From Swiss-Prot:
Classification via Gene3D superfamilies: Glutamyl-tRNA reductase, N-terminal domain, NAD(P)-binding Rossmann-like Domain
GO molecular function: glutamyl-tRNA reductase activity; NADP binding
Enzymatic reactions: (S)-4-amino-5-oxopentanoate + tRNA(Glu) + NADP(+) = L-glutamyl-tRNA(Glu) + NADPH + H(+)
Binding site for NADP(+): G163, A164, G165, E166, I167, G168
Residues reported in the UniProt entry to bind substrate: T38, C39, N40, R41, S84, E89, N90, Q91, Q95
Marked site (Important for activity) residue numbers: H74
Name of the protein: Glutamyl-tRNA reductase
PROSITE patterns xref list: GLUTR
EC number: 1.2.1.70
Functional summary from the UniProt entry: Catalyzes the NADPH-dependent reduction of glutamyl-tRNA(Glu) to glutamate 1-semialdehyde (GSA).
Length: 379
């Protein structure tokens, strides 16, 4: 088991984006591998050592390489959201499933990788079912959505998201899980608004249509990187009752908006309390998750051992059958004028001699440790 990886803990997101693997080239080169790529991580999983990967990945020196038990435990932690930027987040599990299915469709999985990925998916599902590691928003974006849910309820509500950058994307991820009537995305660069709106199954609007979008919406979440105010008191005098959540830094909404009775304004300071409390709740679940991972890792090892034994038995039977056919053909050819008893006598001796010779030859060519750990008849 070998993993190459680069993630948000080592590189900023723009650098990670530049390091992305060309999946078509990668899958074309290797027979057994699975690639997991998200906005926060780039990882490739192999069931054996590889020597020429730098030919496929120009920035290979920037990747970390982990092997064996450490690599397997790393992947189980990834599937559980323990290695995510947002502790316990759900999205990574879906991304792992998609990566597995793509590799399987391309016939690039192996028995070991299938066991590993199916186990990781199972563990990720179990952890989220048996613990609270994914409950409560811990990012500012998800906390904003949680606050809107607490104050108004989001089911069948219209939400306007102003800003389609990094923070806006975090809000979008949190909104996906809610049963919202309509989501509108506004951004100065319309193409970015359009891309994010498609992900949300919502609609994008140009910035010059912002007033109409505000009138239509129940909740407005502001998350731009603008150096000046996007909304001022004069913009909101006649728009009806609204909840506005400003998570931009610097602020998108002039604080004088609080003077309007029809507007409830919340800022990033209001959200930090929610985010911090939820993070503490999730952190309390970490030891439980770690115990589940350790337990499931033990089960995985037994599954792999069973699979290995089954493969050994299959290979041994194939080897024996191959020897039997060859020695029987030789015995019949050399003993044409002999009785069946003589043919069987010669065949049985040759059969045993061939198997014994192969085993002894291999035994003398390797160390005692290698002999005990290897499958001699596959050599």
């Amino acid at each position: 088991m070998l993993v190459i990886k680069a993630d948000y803990k080592k590189y900023p997101l723009p650098v990670l984006e530049s390091m992305r693997i060309n999946e078509d080239e990668f899958y074309g080169k290797y027979d057994a591998c699975i690639i997991v790529q998200t906005c926060n991580r780039i990882e490739a999983y192999f069931d054996e050592e590889i020597n020429d990967i730098e030919k496929i990945i120009p920035d290979f020196k920037g990747f970390d390489v982990i092997k064996g038990k450490k690599a397997t435990l790393h992947f189980l932690n990834v599937a559980c959201g323990m290695d995510s930027m947002i502790l316990g987040e759900n999205q990574i599990l879906g991304q792992i499933k998609s990566s597995y299915h793509k590799s399987k469709e391309l016939k690039k999985t192996s028995k070991y990788l299938e066991n590993l990925f199916l186990k990781a998916i199972h563990v990720g599902q179990r952890v989220r079912a048996e613990t609270k590691i994914n409950e409560g928003g811990v990012s500012i974006g998800s906390a904003a959505v949680e606050l809107a849910e607490m104050k108004l309820g989001l089911k069948n509500r219209n939400v306007l998201l102003i800003g389609a950058g990094e923070i806006g994307t975090l809000v979008a991820k949190a909104l996906i899980e809610k049963h919202i009537k309509a989501v509108i995305v506004a951004n100065r660069t319309y193409e970015r608004a359009e891309t994010l709106a498609k992900e949300l199954k919502g609609m994008a609007v140009h910035f010059d249509k912002l007033k109409e979008a505000i009138n239509f919406s129940d909740v407005i979440i502001c998350a731009t990187s603008s150096p000046h105010y996007i909304l001022e008191k004069s913009d909101l005098l006649d728009v009806g009752n609204k909840i506005i959540i400003d998570i931009a830094n610097p602020r998108d909404v002039d604080d004088s908006v609080r003077e309007l009775e029809n507007i409830s304004l919340y800022t990033i300071d209001d959200l930090r309390n929610i985010s911090d409390k939820n993070l503490q709740k999730r952190l309390k679940e970490v030891p439980i998750v770690e115990n589940i991972i350790e337990e499931e890792y033990g089960i995985l090892l037994k599954q792999i051992e069973k699979t290995n034994v089954e493969e050994v038995i299959k290979d041994f039977n194939t080897y024996i059958e191959d020897v039997r056919k060859k020695e029987l053909e030789k015995a019949v050819r050399l003993c044409k004028n002999k009785s069946p008893d003589e043919i069987m006598e010669n065949f049985s001796k040759a059969f045993v001699k061939r198997i014994t010779h192969d085993f002894v030859s291999y035994s003398l060519s390797v160390s005692k440790e290698d002999l005990l750990n290897s499958i001699w008849w596959k050599k």
